[in-house]
Amino acid sequence: MIFLTTLPLFWIMISASRGGHWGAWMPSSISAFEGTCVSIPCRFDFPDELRPAVVHGVWYFNSPYPKNYPPVVFKSRTQVVHESFQGRSRLLGDLGLRNCTLLLSTLSPELGGKYYFRGDLGGYNQYTFSEHSVLDIINTPNIVVPPEVVAGTEVEVSCMVPDNCPELRPELSWLGHEGLGEPTVLGRLREDEGTWVQVSLLHFVPTREANGHRLGCQAAFPNTTLQFEGYASLDVKYPPVIVEMNSSVEAIEGSHVSLLCGADSNPPPLLTWMRDGMVLREAVAESLYLDLEEVTPAEDGIYACLAENAYGQDNRTVELSVMYAPWKPTVNGTVVAVEGETVSILCSTQSNPDPILTIFKEKQILATVIYESQLQLELPAVTPEDDGEYWCVAENQYGQRATAFNLSVEFAPIILLESHCAAARDTVQCLCVVKSNPEPSVAFELPSRNVTVNETEREFVYSERSGLLLTSILTLRGQAQAPPRVICTSRNLYGTQSLELPFQGAHRLMWAKIGPVGAVVAFAILIAIVCYITQTRRKKNVTESPSFSAGDNPHVLYSPEFRISGAPDKYESEKRLGSERRLLGLRGEPPELDLSYSHSDLGKRPTKDSYTLTEELAEYAEIRVK
């Protein structure tokens, strides 16, 4: 824009009307296009008392002092001028009317400079005015853009050209305004401190796309080839818009992740990476990376990019999904239940993607769910069979984890059918196997003796627990006659169960009773057969008379063993025998039956030949009854 600082013309005229002193007025600066002309308006004044007959004047170039011999632009007295101004300068004003307006034609760059006027009234009445005008020779129109152009807000851009040549008048037009929507153009002529300016106003609403747009103005002079163009680039301010950002990102745990955020704005934005309200990185830039080294599941989540400047802000988010194997499952729920209750067990874990969850027991799948982080196991009316160890397994394509847990079902005692009594000679052992939770108490009752023995009496009862099974063994000795009835009773806080224990191997007792008589008969028959064979064959004259003497043969005691797996080897203790006999001898029981016999094995030796004596093939057994 051209700024002129000289006083307005009307102020000079007022001052001149008062008269009485030397003075001049002209614009301090004036401009014109190269090749055109310019009219420099000028008025001067002098004291009224001088009253000259003729007034002359001189225009100098770049110096007001004649002593310096400055180039003469115009001289009214002699018409002698500097060669640079030959045919280019003439006076438009009437010096007698104190008008010193100068016209310069066919302007060229070397004519740009300071122009001074000197009044010549004759004699010593000559005066060079200090006021001067600076001529600027231009080649382009002046485009004025507001200091701040904001997108979306209407703006006015002006094109100004000097209009100080009375012979050539400029015509203005806009260039490159087609991409500015629907602009409007206004034109006017404006006086600016004695000079004239042709002005064209362009109104439009800029967009962010108009930033950097090259807008031009053209000044053309009709009937000539003179055209002058000027251009200006639009600096459109607009708020940020995020134009580049990652879409959802999937990364495996431990890998490197780089998130990019790019924004378009003017001026450049402040970019900020944030997560959960915490600033992770920020910088004034058009794009900003956020690098995450060895990502963990804790870094999984939503990341936000915020772009802002003085004209607004924008933000966008990106989801980072960290893929990882399931964590060790956690189990919440009932671990102890009473038989018949409903048990609810919740198994949960965390993984990405969600895992396949499975609950199984002893390789049998009880419940499973696909792509869920929780699995609920419902066991209605639990039974003792539900007691035991369970596993919750979580797996996805990145790994597998498992957790074991135990369910303890509490129930009343159950005496198993394998419970029984067994007798061997004078020893009776009773086995009572109880399934129970919690551990029960076990007692053996002998109704015929009116005696009850429990596991605290370790001389008679041995107990051992394995899991839910409790095995109790009652050992009775000195039972030569029929063994007594034995009832096993087990109880805990949930109930009581009793069972009369059946006897196994009862035929052994029968053989123990008839054994002495049968043995005598068997030996008698054996002797008869031997004698018959001896007399028949007459091969050998052998006289044998078998003799059975109690003193010749030691007692051989037959005591078959009855053992239960895990039972202690304490049955031969003398103290035990004494205690057991005292227990069984209560209430006037009959005395013990001591049966001693030796066993005869008729088939021990192989047959030699048909002449071998039967006595040589058989062993004998002595049976003694007391």
Swiss-Prot record:
Annotated TM spans: 517-536
Region annotated Required for normal axon myelination in the central nervous system, chain positions: 577-626
Keyword annotations from UniProtKB, A to Z: Cell adhesion, Cell membrane, Disulfide bond, Glycoprotein, Immunoglobulin domain, Lectin, Lipid-binding, Lipoprotein, Membrane, Palmitate, Phosphoprotein, Repeat, Signal, Transmembrane, Transmembrane helix, Ubl conjugation
Presence of keyword DNA-binding: no
Ig-like V-type domain sequence ranges: 22-120
Residues on Extracellular side: 20-516
Membrane topology, Cytoplasmic segments: 537-626
Main location: membrane
Signal sequence, renumbered to the chain: 1-19
Glycan-carrying positions: N99, N223, N246, N315, N332, N406, N450, N454
One GO term describing the cellular component: membrane raft
Membrane topology: Single-pass type I membrane protein
Region (Interaction with RTN4R and RTN4RL2): 20-325
Localisation per UniProt entry: Cell membrane; Membrane raft
Subunit description: Monomer and homodimer. Interacts (via the first three N-terminal Ig-like domains) with RTN4R and RTN4RL2. Interacts with isoform 2 of BSG.
Protein name in UniProt: Myelin-associated glycoprotein
